[in-house]
Amino acid sequence: MQQQQQPSIDQLPEPTASTSNSATTKPTIATATTSTTTTSGNNFHQQLQATTAATMQRLRTTFTRSRTPTGAEMKMQNSLEVPKQVRSASFDEMQLESQRASSSLLKQQSSSSASADERSSEAGFLQVPLAAHQQRSHSFDSATASAGSDDSGTFLEVPRRLKARRSSSTKTPPPCIHCHYLEEYERRMTAEQRYFIDHRELTALSYSNTSSEASEDEDEVEGHNAEEEEEGSAAIEDAEEETTEAATEEADEDPRTEVESEHDHDPDDDAALEMDIRIGNMSQGSSIEESRARLPRQMRRHTIGSSSVTSASEDEGLEGSDNGSPHFGNTLLPPQPTTPCGITFTLSPTNGDYPSPPHLPLDPGSPPISPCSSNSGRLPALAPIISTPCSSADADDAGAAMGLPVRARRRSISRQEAIFVEPTGNSLENVSHEEVDNSNTKSSVDTADSLDEASTMATCGSPGAAGGSGASSSHHNAFVVRDIYLMVPDLKRDRAASVDSCFSKLSSNAKTEELQPSADGCFLTVPNINATRSRSVDIVLPTDEQARYKALSMTGSTVTYADGRTASASNSRRPIRIVPDWTENAVQGEHYWKPTSASGDLCCLNEECIKSGQRMKCSACQLVAHHNCIPFVNEKSTLACKPTYRDVGIRQYREQTTTHHHWVHRKLEKGKCKQCGKFFPMKQAVQSKLFGSKEIVALACAWCHEIYHNKEACFNQAKIGEECRLGNYAPIIVPPSWIVKLPTKGNFKSSIRVSNKNNAASGSGGGGAGGGAGGGGGKSKKQTQRRQKGKEEKKEPRAFIVKPIPSPEVIPVIVFINPKSGGNQGHKLLGKFQHLLNPRQVFDLTQGGPKMGLDMFRKAPNLRVLACGGDGTVGWVLSVLDQIQPPLQPAPAVGVLPLGTGNDLARALGWGGGYTDEPIGKILREIGMSQCVLMDRWRVKVTPNDDVTDDHVDRSKPNVPLNVINNYFSFGVDAHIALEFHEAREAHPERFNSRLRNKMYYGQMGGKDLILRQYRNLSQWVTLECDGQDFTGKLRDAGCHAVLFLNIPSYGGGTHPWNDSFGASKPSIDDGLMEVVGLTTYQLPMLQAGMHGTCICQCRKARIITKRTIPMQVDGEACRVKPSVIEIELLNKALMLSKRKHGRGDVQVNPLEKMQLHILRVTMQQYEQYHYDKEMLRKLANKLGQIEIESQCDLEHVRNMLNTKFEESISYPKVSQDWCFIDSCTAEHYFRIDRAQEHLHYICDIAIDELYILDHEAATMPQTPDQERSFAAFSQRQAQNERRQMDQAQGRGPGSTDEDLQIGSKPIKVMKWKSPILEQTSDAILLAAQSGDLNMLRALHEQGYSLQSVNKNGQTALHFACKYNHRDIVKYIIASATRRLINMADKELGQTALHIAAEQNRRDICVMLVAAGAHLDTLDSGGNTPMMVAFNKNANEIATYLESKQGTQPVDGWLDD
C-alpha cells in the first residue's frame, strides 16, 4: 500500500496559537535534550514541543470511540486493518509515536553537534497526556465500578463462569469510611516497613553524569537544589511560549533540574502515570552497562538486560531478588523459549493520521521488512530506558527520599498483561531497519523494565543501537512502528466478540478451548499475578492464519475461607449451614444462612453478584447474598461473619480474652447513629427498597449492635481496634474467648521432648509378664486393655471446650430451641437468638438434643438454660440434666419460652401461654432478671399387674411414655382425647399448624366423648391409694371419667381444676404434695369457663392399680397402658426460672460455690510415659489429700494455698518446691501449665474433681550408676501382682478385719488402717526394711502403716535400709514419707539416716538423702556431723561430697513437719 512520508525536520511548521493552546491546555511532553548553550538548542525544543503536541492531538482525534461495526460489515471486510472505533487508544502507541518523532529530531541534533562525547547523557521524561473520562474507553471505567471489589481499579474485569458481565453504566457507589481506614492503616504500615528497608539505599543514590562537565557542576547543583526545584515547578505551570522557554533555560543550566522540575509538577495531575519513560541519548562509546550504571541505584535495581553480571557490592543491600525466578515483581525478564503464546500483535502498513519520518523512503508496494533482517538505514535508534518501581509504595518512598513529590499511582489504566508483542513475518509492517553489528546487538527485551516498555521495545529496535560510536552509528538498526494491529484467531463469527469467549465456550465433553502457543518461542514472559485483562481490546477479527486449540479441563477453583483454610470449589464446597459446626472441620467466620424475601435486602457482592438463586440472609451478622453467590462470599475475608470461638493452642487461650467490634456494612438501616444521635433518613430507606441502592449508609457492630453513619465525622479510626462491650446483653452473652477449639487428634504438641508410647507399652507389658508368672497376670492385662479400648471407642471426641472466666456479674444463658414447636415458630426464633447472642450458645434440639450443650457448658458459672418449646421440650431438658454424669454442680436454672400448644408449665412460672412475636431482647432481659424457684419432680414406676389377664388392645404398651412427672399425670377420658390428637397429627401433620385449629380439634373430640361416655365406669377399672388410704369409693361416688395428679396449678391450656378453698394448704410447685382431682365429661369442658373439678386429696405418694388397658398421659405425652401397678413418689426438686413478681421468694443459689478437689501427685517419669493415658496415670498417682477452694481462684492463689498446707500439715508428704499444675480436663492428653501463666488460669480450667500436680524433683532424683530402672517403672511392673501377693500373704477373706503377715518364721499381728491422717505403727515395717522386701513394705504402707515406725532405740525403717544398703527401700521411703522422717535421729547415738550412710560408706544412698533434703549440719551425740563421720571412717569421697554440698544447700532448706 501507498505510504505517506513525514516531512523533514527543516519542513516542520512553526508552532501556531492553536498548537500552543493545545499544548498548554492538554498535558505536554517535555523531553530533556543535551545540555548546550547555543540558540539552536532552544529552537530545537520549541519545534519538538510543537511536533509532539500536534501528534498527541492527532492521536486523541484518531482514537475517538465510535459505533461498533455490525456483522454484515465485518463479513465485507477484507483488510487486516482493525477499525479504530472498536478499541481504546493504547498508551503504548502514544509513547511509540512520540518516541519516534523525538528520535528523528535528536538524531539530527546529534549529527550537527561538534563532539558527541561532550554531550550529557542525562535523559528527560516523557509525560503521557491526561486521559479524561470522555477520551478513553468506557471499559476502563468498568474496572472501578465497584469500590468494594478487591480488584477494583487495578485490572479490567473478565467475569467468571456463570457470572454476568459488569455493566459499564453502573455508577460507582460512595466509598466506605471503614474500608478507607483499614486500607490507610495497612498502607501506612507497609510504607513504614519499606521505608526502613530502602532508606539506606536511597540516601546513597548519586545523580552525577558520566561527563566531566557534570561532575564539576555537581556541587553547584546541590547547593541550589531548592531554588532550581521552585523554578522548574514554575516553568511547568506557565502557559504557551513562556513554558517552553523556561523549561529550555532550566534544562541548559543543569540536566538534573529539568528532571526534578518535571517531578515537581502538580501531584494531582492525572497524566502522571505509573511509568516514566526516560529517553536517553547515550554517548559514543558507552554501553548499556554504563547507561545502567548512571541510573540511580533505586532504579538500577529494577533494570535488566545488561550483559555483565552486577557486582556483589552493587547489589549488596538489595532485596526481593527471587533466585531462579523469571521476574522481579511486575518486571518482564528475558523469555524462556519453551513458553510461547499464540496471541500476537501484527504491524500495519498504513495510517494517514501519523506523520511519517522524512528519513524512511520505502517504495510503494515493497514487501514487508522482517524485524530480524538487517537492511541499511540512516537513523540510529535511541535506547529508551524505562524505570518503573515494583509498587506504588516503593515509588512513594523513593520519591520521598529523593526530595520529589509523591504521586498517586494511576491503577485504572494499568496495562493488560495477557497481550504479547511479536513481529511476525507474514504481517505488513512499516518499519525501518539498518544493518546491525551482531556482536553489539542486544535483544530488545533485555532492557525492558516493564510491560509497556517490553511492548514498545519489541517493535522499536535494539537498545544496543545507541551504544556504538559516531562512525558506526548508521550501521545499527532501529524498528519504528507506525501502526499496531491485532492478529487474533478467526472463530468465524458474524460480529465482533472477545477472545475470552473461546475460553468460556464448553464443548460436548465439558472442555474449554485454549490457544496453543507457536513453536518459535520469540515471546515475552509475562509474570503470572492472576491479573485480568480488558475485553474491549481483544476483538475477534479475520486473519490469514488459523489459531490452534487444545482441550482444557474445567478444574475446580480453590476457595479460601476467612480463617485461611482452602478447599476446592467444585469438590469440597462447604454446605450452607443454619447452626454452627461443632466438629473439627469448623471454620472461623462461617455464616448461618436462612431464606429471606424482605424488600431492600441487597446482595453484598454488588457488581460481582451473579444474581442467581434465592436471597439468603446470615442470622448472625445480617449479611445478604444470593444462594449462588455464597461461595464467592466465603472467599472474601472482609465479608466474614463475626467470630464465635478462638482457634488457638490450648496453652494460649487465656492470653487474649477481649472481644473487638465486628463492623458490618449496612445499605438499609433503621434507628439512629450513636455518635450524632440522628436517625437514618427514610428517604434513603425507600430508595434502597425501590431502586436497590448500593450505597453504604451505616456501619453496625454485630456484637453490641452500635450503629454509626458512614461518615468520617461519626465513625473514626479508633473504632476499628476498640474493645467491644457486647452491648445491653453482655451479662448473658458467651464471649468468643470462652469457647476454644481443640487441636485435632495427632496435632497436639506436648511439652515432652520424647513421647514414646511403644516404650511405655512394652514396659507395662514386661510388668504384666513378670506379675503373671504366678497366676495369669498377662491375661488380665489383655482383658484390661480390651476394656479400655472399648471405652475409648464409645467416648466421642470433642472438638470444642468452654473455658469460662468466673465472675458473679456474668449470667450466661444457653438456648435450646425446638424448631417444630408452635407451628414452626422455632425456625424464626433460631435466627433472632443467633443475631443477639453468640451463635454457639444457641442449639437446635433436632441436631442431637440438649446433652452436648449442657455437658459443654457445665463449668460456666451461674449458668441458665432457656428452653424454647412446649412442656415436652422442658421435660426433655430436665431429664437430660438428670442423666448427665457427673451431675452439674450447681444445677443450672431452666427457663421457658412457650411455643407449644398448652404451655401449662410456662403459665405456672409466669411466662405466659405462648409466644406472640414479642421482641427477643425483652425476653432476654427478663431471663436475666428472673428469679430462681424450686419445682417438685415425681417418679413414675410401672409394673405389670399379674392378677389380671391382658386384654390385647391394639397399640398398647407396658409402660408410660415418661417416667418423670413435671406437670401432671392423668388417665381416663382426657388422656384418650390427647391420644387421638397425637395420632391424628402424626398421620396428617400439615393440618395442625395453627394453635387455634388445635384447640378446636380438642373441643371437637371432647364433645364427641361427652355423648359417647366411654369411661363412665372408670372407677370400676382402677384402684386408687394415696398415702396408704383408699380413695376408690370417692371416685365411684363422684362418677369421675378421668383422674388428675397435678404438680402445677395449670392444666389443659390455662385451666385450674383444683379449688384453692379445698385442702389444708394452698397448692404450690415446691410443697412436696400432689393434688388429686376427679373430672367428669361434663366438668371437662366447663374448666374453660373457670369451673373446677372434684377435689379428692393432697398426697405425697400414690398407688394406682388398673384392671384393663387405659389411656394415660404424662405431661401431654399419651399412650395406652396395659393392666399394671403404677407408683408415684417424689424424685427431686428442679431449679426453674420464674418471672419476677413482688412477694415471691427467690431461691439463693451460690454460683461460685467451693470445689472439693482431691490432690494427686504425679512424678515426671510417670507423666512422660502416661500423659496420654488418663486412667493409668490416675492409678499411678499418689494421693496427697483433699482441698476445698473457690472456683474463681486463679492458679497462683492455689499454689500459695497448697505450699502452705505442704509446709504446715504432717499429713502431706514431701513435695518439691518446683512442682507445677497439670491440666487434666481440657484436651485428650494431660499437659503442664507454665508457671508464668498461672495468673491467667483458674482452678476450674484444669480440674473437675481431681487436682494433679507434677513433682519434678521425684523424676530428677540422682540415680545410682548400677540402677537399671527407676522406682516409678518398678512400681508399675509390680502393680498387677501386688494384690495377688497380698491375698496370698494375708490368707483372709474379703470380709475380715485383721490379718497375719508371715515374715520369716515370726507371725506379726497388725491391725487394719482406719484413719486417713493418723497412720498406725508396726514392727513389720522395720522387718521389711531390714530384710529388703520392698513388696512387703509397699503392701504394709498401702494398708495404712506408718513409715515412721520406730523400735525401742528410736531407729526407723530408713535407718535399717541405709545400714543394710537397700537402695530400693531408701528410694521408696524418700518418695513416700514426710520430711520429718529423713532427719529423724535415733535415741541411742543421735544419728540420722545420713550419719549411718556416711558411716557405712554408702555413697549412692548419701546422694539420694542429700537430694531429698537431709540436713548436713545435724550433730549426733558425739558432736559429729555426717561429713565428720565420713572422715573418721576414711570415706574421703563421701566426706568431700558432703563438704561440697554444704555451701549449695538453701538457707530455708527443707523444713521439718
Swiss-Prot record:
Zinc finger (Phorbol-ester/DAG-type): 591-641, 661-724
Stored Pfam families: Ank_2, C1_1, DAGK_acc, DAGK_cat, DGKI
Chain intervals with Basic and acidic residues compositional bias: 254-266
Cleaved signal peptide residues: none
Gene3D superfamilies documented for this protein: 2.60.200.40, Ankyrin repeat-containing domain, Probable inorganic polyphosphate/atp-NAD kinase, domain 1
Catalytic activity entry: a 1,2-diacyl-sn-glycerol + ATP = a 1,2-diacyl-sn-glycero-3-phosphate + ADP + H(+)
Biased composition regions of type Basic residues, renumbered to the chain: 294-303, 779-789
Domain DAGKc: 808-944
Compositional bias segments (type: Gly residues): 763-778
Region span, Disordered: 1-123, 136-177, 207-339, 758-799, 1264-1302
Keywords (A to Z) from UniProt: ANK repeat, ATP-binding, Kinase, Membrane, Metal-binding, Nucleotide-binding, Repeat, Sensory transduction, Transferase, Vision, Zinc, Zinc-finger
GO biological process, one term: lipid phosphorylation
Record's compositionally biased regions (Low complexity): 22-62, 98-115, 141-154
One Gene Ontology CC term in the entry: plasma membrane
Gene inactivation effect: Flies exhibit photoreceptor cells that degenerate within a week after eclosion.
Job description of the protein: Required for the maintenance of phospholipid turnover within the photoreceptor.
Protein name: Eye-specific diacylglycerol kinase
